[in-house]
Amino acid sequence: MEFKIDGTSQGARACTIKTAHSTILTPVFMPVGTQGTVKALDANDMLELGAKIILGNTYHLYLRPGSKLIKKFGGLHGFSKFPNSFLTDSGGFQAFSLSNNSKPDENGITFKSHIDGSRHYFTPKSVLDTQYDLNSDIMMILDDLVALPNTDERIKTSIQRTTKWAQEAINYHMEQKQKGIGTHQNIFAIIQGGTSKEFRKLSAQQLCDMSDFDGFAIGGLSVGEPNEQMYETVEWTTQFMPKDKPRYLMGVGTPEDLIENIERGVDMFDCVMPTRNARNGTLFTSFGKLNIKKAEFKDDANPIDNECSCYTCKNFSRAYLNHLFRAAEITYFRLASIHNIHYYLNLMKQAREAILADNWSEFKKEFYVKRSK
């Protein structure tokens, strides 16, 4: 991986990340392709939208169709025909959240499949083996995620395990690269610690001392804590993260969350929000959210957003989308998802331009002014 900082403004960073499959300009939002596809869209749609990197989910792909099958097709790129970069998470979050009785121990996580109830065990090495099969460009390590709020003792245990597993993972990755496995794949560690400054500092320092990691993520946020608490935690944590490596905030979030955390030095984001909200009738626009289900749009000839240049806005009216949603037409999911993802990707493009022009404050102010009208 190549990484360079192209410019900064008010704490916000514009960077370039080069992987084996694409050049990624930051700040970057990564659409979530849980099953190897962004819901309702295919590889061509994502290319038309200009996506340079999307997320794949190790837990789901491990269970179905299985990483060995995907490997036969040349990894995720060959299987999905999306030629640009993939980031795959470790699957730890899904093992934690989807299994009724997941049990972490010192060596990994035992969980039951949400599909058929079969028992499985993730370890720092096994999740990397799965990601080697997937041939993703950026692999996330297994981390010990805890629900918030929680006891100090449990959060301390989470940090200790995550650090231990990170060391196991990076050692294993270096060994595998010596064998010619995963030579072009990059590996990120995940900082934990809840919303405690003391714990976040401890986790960040322990992980960031492991210099062989290609980047670092902030995990365990956007799980119900107030927004201001999330922003404070990110601002506190980034100061302990290296400036010369990518910074990734996992599972975040709303357009406002992205703007606030870009200002706090974050480079990379992912969230299911644009596609999930699209399917539920909520569309993102330059002036805020629009609920296409409302009767007021039944005969509205305007596009979703007059300032938007996406395929949906260039071709279809609010009235048509209102009709498709009410009729439960599958086409609605595609057109709405195209719009919402375009909105997110374009917001990141505008943010980058503002950073490079060193007028972040003006950009951020205008972002909020338009949404308050």
UniProtKB/Swiss-Prot annotation:
Substrate binds at D89, S90, G91, G92, F93, D143, Q192, G220. Zn(2+) binds at C308, C310, C313, H339. SUPFAM superfamilies: tRNA-guanine transglycosylase. One of its GO terms (cellular component) is cytosol. It catalyses: 7-aminomethyl-7-carbaguanine + guanosine(34) in tRNA = 7-aminomethyl-7-carbaguanosine(34) in tRNA + guanine. The keyword Kinase does not apply. The keyword Transferase applies. One of its GO terms (molecular function) is tRNA-guanosine(34) queuine transglycosylase activity. Its EC number is 2.4.2.29. GO terms for biological process: queuosine biosynthetic process; tRNA-guanine transglycosylation. It is an enzyme of class 2 (transferase). Keywords: Glycosyltransferase, Metal-binding, Queuosine biosynthesis, Transferase, tRNA processing, Zinc. Pfam families: TGT (PF01702). Pathway: tRNA modification; tRNA-queuosine biosynthesis. Residues 251-257, 275-279 are annotated as: RNA binding. Its cofactor is Zn(2+). Binds 1 zinc ion per subunit. The active site is at D89, D270. PANTHER family: QUEUINE TRNA-RIBOSYLTRANSFERASE CATALYTIC SUBUNIT 1. Homodimer. Within each dimer, one monomer is responsible for RNA recognition and catalysis, while the other monomer binds to the replacement base PreQ1. Catalyzes the base-exchange of a guanine (G) residue with the queuine precursor 7-aminomethyl-7-deazaguanine (PreQ1) at position 34 (anticodon wobble position) in tRNAs with GU(N) anticodons (tRNA-Asp, -Asn, -His and -Tyr). Catalysis occurs through a double-displacement mechanism. The nucleophile active site attacks the C1' of nucleotide 34 to detach the guanine base from the RNA, forming a covalent enzyme-RNA intermediate. The proton acceptor active site deprotonates the incoming PreQ1, allowing a nucleophilic attack on the C1' of the ribose to form the product. Belongs to the queuine tRNA-ribosyltransferase family. This is Queuine tRNA-ribosyltransferase. It comes from Aliarcobacter butzleri (strain RM4018) (Arcobacter butzleri). The lineage of its organism: Bacteria, Pseudomonadati, Campylobacterota, Epsilonproteobacteria, Campylobacterales.
